[in-house]
Amino acid sequence: SAQLNQPAIQTFIEQFRKVADSYSGDRFLMGELHGDDPTLASETFTAPGRLHATYNFSLLEWGGLDVDGLKSAISAAIGRFNGSGRLSFAFSNHDVPRSATRQLAPLGLSEDDQEAMQLLLLKLEASLIGSTCVYQGEELALSDVQDIPISQMQDPWGIEFAPLFLGRDTCRTPMVWEKAKNNWSGFSEASKTWLPIAEKHIQRSGIDEAARSGSVYDQFSKFLAWRAQQPAMVHANSM
């Protein structure tokens, strides 16, 4: 886009990188770049001395019912970046329904099979080159909250177009850390949260899922620990 092509933007990114590099410890700068040619934008902004990686939208745009579409989305993303850590992948973020709702629910699976598919998507994402971006709740196999009253919505799109379009609040409800309800399930000690806590999420709280053997969280954590010990997974120049 015209904005991204401004030389001043690239100069600013280089200055920003110098500031980040002046600190000790691990640092990672990722840019959310979209435009007419996001791959070209990624190449430009991850040149030496700029960002470490850019956010990739290809898997966010996959509908979930088409295996060939998934293969095409991955191939298009890695085609010009094969072997580079400058890529990142995400199935969900704060602007689209979670993968459990957008990509898996249309399959009509049982709860157990949907959990298995959620774990499979997470493992697939973590097996691709580059960085993995897991959106809050994916590791718990959470689906979106689609029964938020209009009076409690915050997203202008949802307020304007519900019930035809529920907006983005459905994937933005508070993270549920524990089953206790007296502190918004561990999320906040405030008298009110920005969006309501989802009752169905309380049964999959972070603490409980982390302790439950065989949960998506448990299995994905073990997979990531295994992945970190596989040189081919960490350093290979292809999927």
Give the label of every model feature segment:
Residues 39-40:
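Catalytic core of soluble alpha/beta enzymes
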Residues 66:
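Conserved NTP/Mg2+-binding pocket subregion across the NTase superfamily
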Residues 1-7:
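Aromatic- and acidic-residue-enriched carbohydrate-binding clefts of CAZyme catalytic domains
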Residues 7, 11-27, 35, 44-56, ...:
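Loop/helix patches that line or flank the sugar-binding groove of alpha-linked glycan CAZymes
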